[in-house]
Structures are given as structure tokens and as C-alpha cells.
């Protein structure tokens, strides 16, 4: 086992694509070897991204009343969750959200709306706000607005959006157990359309939703095939009223194995610690940042996060460097 782990970073950095069997073996590594696994994943992060870290921040621009039945989500209208539903917030609030993002040193600001897809009018309103933001504030703008077509993506791109978030969440096999109101294929086609119009892709998963090791490896493999730019890692916080309210939290050790797997399978992708990171990683949060190079700061859609100052302290403590002012990560130190 030790020999297998010690060779992982070298294999990846030499251009080898780890196999499904490798992935399953990584997830089954005994906890006593976890430090060694983290070291290998960290070597890959450092070789590709160096010591740079990016904060991103979001605004919950339209909340609740969602027609979809994602089993983990508080915003679905199918479940009796205590949520304050509201329509798309006005332009002023979208711009103020970007100002707040800049104030906490976020380099990216994501406008997120509930629902299967945004209406044409909503897309136009978002594009109008994005123009003002990109003209006046040093922050990159992303959107997460559900299923979106090529026409709307081109409008958003022209307004200044440079990245779109659309998560596959889990494997194709497990997806139907989590969502029934739309298909995995539909989400996959949206991601491919985003790539077709030349926008950056941010697409990740949520873990702790009843998936198997095979589901996790399959998702990491799909993102490798798609060559996505950013992978947000979310960990379930069971929400009362949703079908997954009784799910057990993942252990920090399990989370670290998943994060390591995604880094080793997707060395060129930004790895972004997002929802549930504080509760699930607990005292291993700094350890996870040895592997990741991005953090969702300032809170999530329906849950508060930890104070942004704590994340900044963590970056300093680890000897890492924040990128701000619309900077991109420096040129990769190695080609993978």
C-alpha cells in the first residue's frame, strides 16, 4: 500500500491517467496512510498551481420555489423546508454583492439563481448587472443559473461573464436516485454548450448523498474527460425536510480521500472547497487546503459559512498567496 501511494504524484505528473481501479484503491486506503496520500495529492497541486489560492463568493440572487426535486436541496418546492422564497433581486443588490465579494478579497463572484433555468428576462437583467460590475470592480463574474442555451450564454459572455457553474453532482448511475425531474444527460449537455461558446467551466459534486466509491471515481473520471476548469467540492449538510435529512455526515478522513482522488484525477483543474467544508472537515480543514487551491468564502446559498477572516488567516498560516484583482493563476509550472 505504501509503495502504491508514494508513486501516485510521479505517475500523474508524468502524464499518466490513473485507472478506475487506482481510484477505488485510493478511496479504500486505510486511515493510517492518509497523511501520505495527502502529501502525494499536495505535490500535484504544488507542481501545477504553486502556492496560489483563490477566494470566490456568491450571491443567492433568486431563492427557493424550485420546480426540481434534488434530494439534498432546501430550495426545492417539493419539500417542506423552512426557506424564504424570493424572485431575482434587483440590479442594485447584484452590484452590491460584487462589492462585498471584493471586500473579502474574492477574485470571483458568482450570481446564483434557483430553478431549472432562468427566464430570458432574468438572463437579460443579470447581463445588465454584470456589465456594470465588470466595468467598475476588480472581480471576475460567474453565473449559476441552471440549464442554459447557447443564445443566453453568448449574451452573458458578451456582458462580461467568463465562467459558468453547472454541477453534475454525482455519477450518471446514482443521479436518478437523487434527482428525477431532469436528467444527467441534460446537465452534461449544458456543460458541453458552455464549452462550445468559449466560457470557462465550473462543475463539481456533492458527497455524502448515498454514493458508492464507484460513483465518486466515475464522477472524477467524467470531469477529466471533459477537461473542466474548476471543480467545486461540496459535502452534504443534511437539511430537515429533505429526503436526505437522515444521512450521516462524512468523516473528515473520508472527505480527504475524496479530495485527494479528485486532485490526482484532475491535476489541471482548480479544486474548490465549498459547501459543508467547515462541518465535515472540522479540524482537518487546513489539511484539505494542502490539496485544494480555491475556497468559497463568505457563506453559501442557504447556509452561513465561517468568517472570511478565518480563511485569510488559514492562507497565511499555510504560507500560501491570495490572487485578487481579476488575476488568473500563474502559468502552470509543469505540463500534465
Swiss-Prot record:
What residues bind [4Fe-4S] cluster, as annotated? 66, 70, 73
What reactions does this protein catalyze? (4R,5S)-dethiobiotin + (sulfur carrier)-SH + 2 reduced [2Fe-2S]-[ferredoxin] + 2 S-adenosyl-L-methionine = (sulfur carrier)-H + biotin + 2 5'-deoxyadenosine + 2 L-methionine + 2 oxidized [2Fe-2S]-[ferredoxin]
Q: Does the keyword S-adenosyl-L-methionine apply?
A: yes
The record describes how the cofactor is bound as:
Binds 1 [4Fe-4S] cluster. The cluster is coordinated with 3 cysteines and an exchangeable S-adenosyl-L-methionine.
Where do the annotations place [2Fe-2S] cluster binding?
110, 142, 202, 272
Give one GO term, molecular function aspect: biotin synthase activity
Supply the alphabetized keyword list.
2Fe-2S, 4Fe-4S, Biotin biosynthesis, Iron, Iron-sulfur, Metal-binding, S-adenosyl-L-methionine, Transferase
Cofactor names: [4Fe-4S] cluster; [2Fe-2S] cluster
Pathway noted in the entry:
Cofactor biosynthesis; biotin biosynthesis; biotin from 7,8-diaminononanoate: step 2/2
- Subunit and interaction comment: Homodimer.
The job of this chain, per UniProt, is described as:
Catalyzes the conversion of dethiobiotin (DTB) to biotin by the insertion of a sulfur atom into dethiobiotin via a radical-based mechanism.
What's this protein's family per the entry?
Belongs to the radical SAM superfamily. Biotin synthase family.
Q: What is this protein called?
A: Biotin synthase
Q: Which organism is it from?
A: Persephonella marina (strain DSM 14350 / EX-H1)
- The coding gene here is bioB
